[in-house]
């Protein structure tokens, strides 16, 4: 059965990764339906495109589907999952559906604990600049295409590869990018060693004629891939890398190391509108993918110059009364440090007020020590209750306790009640930069603050 003739039903279609895939299959010509507990902007967009979306989960929603696609957020006892099992309808994770689309194209898969969405969107910007009409699947709304997905007529597919449940092993890309490997999603992997092995095994899926692109700044990551049996390219700020990036404040240069001759030469220069060393690294990874696909460096640089960002990544929401409001998805200590350093780079003299909502009890517990020192670039930190993401509370793991152990002099526990917006408005003054951080629903508070300024 060809994809365009199949009937797909998505369980959890409102999720940021699921909605893009549903849109892509709909545009290919497949019959697509979906369901979610709550309606949101993603489900509304799908409805506008003509996709049938059910609010809530019920066995009848499955209908005459040929295959049921589920997200990692869906619980085992979901009635639609049970219905598919009872009727022996194939059940596949999101990554397997993406893998089926990737089989029709030349795939570029962007993996890594941090920076996947940004790197995927930067890579997409480069391929768009080169007029290659790529198919795109991103875990965030990409400003250049005003969506999370786009069906292109070209031969390349640029996709974000989510490692959180290990299902990215379903993908077989021609080019794989690994931005970094950090200790996260231990609710699935159990140990950091399992996380490392998962990325190693993902990279093994690349064919002999493909390329694995890895940030080599982390010695542990270099160790994992040092004698890797595929064509590999290390990039980063460290002089040991094959491609070395230098520069700061939005202007960067890339040099190529010739290990055999012991020489180094300039490959090219590029400019970025988005601040931060982490974004410079993301950009170099995207350049590597572009050049590997035959795109000239100059075209890659032009694509990056056009890059305006992606939703929920250093996202400027607006300014009123001299107060700027931003939102960022960062929810791991490594991400928090990187994004706050980027804010400090962009606003060296302004007061930075950060509202942070931890995401998952398990992550908060595992990263507890790192969280206590992750906010040093902020001037004031407001720590609200943990967003559970379906997890049960863990005794002793609370935001109130974490706030009391923070090394930051001006960190405090903040109750998000019906007076929260007014309390924050009372703290802010002209010239401040207010940032909502986290993978939960804290961004809504930022909009409320902006609307009431």
Swiss-Prot record:
Cited SUPFAM superfamilies: MurCD N-terminal domain (SSF51984), MurD-like peptide ligases, catalytic domain (SSF53623), MurD-like peptide ligases, peptide-binding domain (SSF53244)
Binding of ATP, residues: 112-118
Family: Belongs to the MurCDEF family.
Pfam annotation, one family: Mur_ligase_C
GO cellular component, one term: cytoplasm
E.C. number: 6.3.2.8
One GO term (biological process): peptidoglycan biosynthetic process
Protein name listed in UniProt: UDP-N-acetylmuramate--L-alanine ligase
TM segment ranges: none
Function: Cell wall formation.
Pathway where this protein functions: Cell wall biogenesis; peptidoglycan biosynthesis
Organism: Bdellovibrio bacteriovorus (strain ATCC 15356 / DSM 50701 / NCIMB 9529 / HD100)
Reactions that this protein is recorded to catalyse: UDP-N-acetyl-alpha-D-muramate + L-alanine + ATP = UDP-N-acetyl-alpha-D-muramoyl-L-alanine + ADP + phosphate + H(+)
Locations listed in the record: Cytoplasm
Keywords associated with the record: ATP-binding, Cell cycle, Cell division, Cell shape, Cell wall biogenesis/degradation, Cytoplasm, Ligase, Nucleotide-binding, Peptidoglycan synthesis
Gene Ontology MF, one: UDP-N-acetylmuramate-L-alanine ligase activity
């Amino acid at each position: 059965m060809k994809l365009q003739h199949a009937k797909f039903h998505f369980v959890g279609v409102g999720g940021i990764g699921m909605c893009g895939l549903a849109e892509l299959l709909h545009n290919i010509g497949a019959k697509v339906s979906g369901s979610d507990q709550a309606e949101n902007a993603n489900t509304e967009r799908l409805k506008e495109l003509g996709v049938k979306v059910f609010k809530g989960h019920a066995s009848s929603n499955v209908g005459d589907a040929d295959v049921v696609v589920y997200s990692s957020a869906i619980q085992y006892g979901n009635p639609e999952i049970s219905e598919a099992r009872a009727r022996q309808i194939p059940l596949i994770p999101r990554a397997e559906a993406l893998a089926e689309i990737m089989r029709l194209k030349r795939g570029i898969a962007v993996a890594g604990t941090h920076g996947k969405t940004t790197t995927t969107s930067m890579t997409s910007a480069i391929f768009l600049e080169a007029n290659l009409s790529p198919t795109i699947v991103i875990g965030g709304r990409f400003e250049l295409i005003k969506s999370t997905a786009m069906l292109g007529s070209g031969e390349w597919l640029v996709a974000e590869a989510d490692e959180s449940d290990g299902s990215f092993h379903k993908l077989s890309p021609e080019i794989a990018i690994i931005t970094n490997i950090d200790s996260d999603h231990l609710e699935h992997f159990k140990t950091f060693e399992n996380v490392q092995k998962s990325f190693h095994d993902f990279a093994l899926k690349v064919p002999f004629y493909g390329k694995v692109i890895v940030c080599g700044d982390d010695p542990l990551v270099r160790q994992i891939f040092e004698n890797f049996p595929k064509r590999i390219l290390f990039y980063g700020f460290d002089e040991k890398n094959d491609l070395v990036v230098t520069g700061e404040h939005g202007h960067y240069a890339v040099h190529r190391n010739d290990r055999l001759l012991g020489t180094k030469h300039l490959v090219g220069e590029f400019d970025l509108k988005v601040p931060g060393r982490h974004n410079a690294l993301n950009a170099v990874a995207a350049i590597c993918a572009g050049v590997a696909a035959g795109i000239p460096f100059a075209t890659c640089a032009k694509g990056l110059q056009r890059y305006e960002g992606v939703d929920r990544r250093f996202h400027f929401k607006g300014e009123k009364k001299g107060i700027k409001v931003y939102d960022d998805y960062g929810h791991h200590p490594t991400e928090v440090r990187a994004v706050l350093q980027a804010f400090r780079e962009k606003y060296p003299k302004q007061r930075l007020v950060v509202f942070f909502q931890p995401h998952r009890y398990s992550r908060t517990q595992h990263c507890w020590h790192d969280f206590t020192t992750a906010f040093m670039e902020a001037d004031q930190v407001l720590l609200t209750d943990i967003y559970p993401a379906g997890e049960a509370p863990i005794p002793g793991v609370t935001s109130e306790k974490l706030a009391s152990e923070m090394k930051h002099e001006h960190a405090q526990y903040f109750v998000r009640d019906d007076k929260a917006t007014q309390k924050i408005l009372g703290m802010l003054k002209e010239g401040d930069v207010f940032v909502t951080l986290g993978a939960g629903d804290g961004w809504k508070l930022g909009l409320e603050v902006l609307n009431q300024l």
